[in-house]
């Protein structure tokens, strides 16, 4: 029987550090971090995510400004809004909820965010710095993943790691963070052959494909650290890529869904905006 990686408990450790940071800034009469979150349209998933971010931010003493825009907003109007936030000294972090409506060029719009306020690491500037190993904001979900693995006090150096999924938001940056820790990384995707055999040999498995119940106990070994990034709503319940009840009986460590990676992500976002002030 393996151990559960408790994302909520690990997240609380970072929250305690954030509260300490905020209290110290208040004592010194310094600015309190403020996040501006932009949502275009009324996508239910995005609204839930934003409301959760706001709730967590404010509970930690972070100011959170929610900006909700009609789906019909013109691209130039959205850019003008972002440019205004860029020069607003009271705003320290800008988040643009994706996806955007089809009539808006997401790549163009995200490029307009000031790289120093790009706490979700969407701009090409921060992406380039990240992959070159220069100081930059680390994407929130990959940062959550690597910190959860490190919380186990396992030496990542030399470990065989498999990342299933090659998205620019999760898969690729997670692979890069594992490389930075000197793991030997294999990125798998929908065209990968013999996926089950590849995973069986891995010390670390990160699944980020959004296919509920895809990873069974046949994919893991007794030493596997399994990180489930999948979040798919099935019959009103959130489900991960991993068949948790099966895999926990065989692998060494497994993250639950919910209560694993997702519990860390918003905290990492807030950590990024705090670091923007340092």
Swiss-Prot record:
CDD domains associated with the record: NAD_bind_m-THF_DH_Cyclohyd
Catalytic activity: (6R)-5,10-methylene-5,6,7,8-tetrahydrofolate + NADP(+) = (6R)-5,10-methenyltetrahydrofolate + NADPH; (6R)-5,10-methenyltetrahydrofolate + H2O = (6R)-10-formyltetrahydrofolate + H(+)
Signal peptide: none
Pathway: One-carbon metabolism; tetrahydrofolate interconversion
A cellular component annotation (GO) from this entry: cytosol
Keyword flag Transmembrane: no
Keyword set, alphabetical order: Amino-acid biosynthesis, Histidine biosynthesis, Hydrolase, Methionine biosynthesis, Multifunctional enzyme, NADP, One-carbon metabolism, Oxidoreductase, Purine biosynthesis
Taxonomic superkingdom: Bacteria
EC number: 1.5.1.5, 3.5.4.9
InterPro entries: Aminoacid_DH-like_N_sf (IPR046346), NAD(P)-bd_dom_sf (IPR036291), THF_DH/CycHdrlase (IPR000672), THF_DH/CycHdrlase_cat_dom (IPR020630), THF_DH/CycHdrlase_CS (IPR020867), THF_DH/CycHdrlase_NAD-bd_dom (IPR020631)
GO biological process: L-histidine biosynthetic process; methionine biosynthetic process; purine nucleotide biosynthetic process; tetrahydrofolate interconversion
Pfam families: THF_DHG_CYH, THF_DHG_CYH_C
Binding site for NADP(+): 165-167, 190, 231
Record GO terms (molecular function): methenyltetrahydrofolate cyclohydrolase activity; methylenetetrahydrofolate dehydrogenase (NADP+) activity
UniProt key word Iron: no
Family to which this protein belongs: Belongs to the tetrahydrofolate dehydrogenase/cyclohydrolase family.
Subunit architecture: Homodimer.
Function statement: Catalyzes the oxidation of 5,10-methylenetetrahydrofolate to 5,10-methenyltetrahydrofolate and then the hydrolysis of 5,10-methenyltetrahydrofolate to 10-formyltetrahydrofolate.
HAMAP family referenced in this protein's UniProt entry, alphabetically: THF_DHG_CYH
NCBIfam families: PRK14172.1
Protein name according to UniProt: Bifunctional protein FolD
Organism from which the protein derives: Clostridium acetobutylicum (strain ATCC 824 / DSM 792 / JCM 1419 / IAM 19013 / LMG 5710 / NBRC 13948 / NRRL B-527 / VKM B-1787 / 2291 / W)
């Amino acid at each position: 029987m393996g151990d559960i990686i408790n994302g909520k408990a690990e997240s609380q450790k970072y929250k305690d550090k954030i509260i300490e940071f905020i209290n110290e800034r208040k004592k010194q009469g310094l600015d309190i971090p403020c996040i501006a979150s932009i949502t275009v349209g009324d996508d239910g998933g995005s609204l839930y995510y934003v409301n959760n971010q706001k709730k967590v931010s404010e509970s930690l003493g972070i100011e959170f400004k929610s900006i909700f825009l009609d789906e019909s907003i013109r691209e130039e109007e959205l850019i003008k809004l972002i440019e205004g936030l860029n020069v607003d000294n009271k705003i320290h972090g800008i988040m643009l909820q994706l996806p955007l409506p089809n009539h808006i060029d997401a790549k163009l719009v995200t490029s307009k965010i000031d790289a120093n306020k790009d706490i979700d690491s969407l701009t090409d500037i921060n992406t380039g710095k990240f992959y070159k190993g220069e100081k930059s904001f680390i994407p929130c979900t990959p940062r959550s993943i690597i910190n959860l693995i490190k919380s186990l006090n396992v030496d990542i150096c030399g470990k065989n790691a498999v990342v299933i999924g090659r998205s620019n938001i999760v898969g690729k940056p997670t692979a890069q963070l594992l490389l930075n820790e000197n793991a030997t990384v294999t990125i798998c995707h929908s065209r990968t052959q013999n996926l089950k055999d590849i995973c069986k040999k891995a010390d670390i498995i990160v699944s980020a494909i959004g296919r509920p119940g895809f990873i069974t106990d046949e994919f893991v070994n007794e030493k596997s650290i399994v990180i489930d990034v999948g979040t798919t709503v099935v019959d009103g319940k959130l489900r991960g890529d991993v068949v948790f009840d099966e895999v926990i009986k065989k692998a060494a460590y497994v993250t639950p869904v919910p209560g694993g990676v997702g519990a860390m992500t918003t905290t990492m976002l807030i950590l990024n905006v705090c670091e923007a002030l340092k």
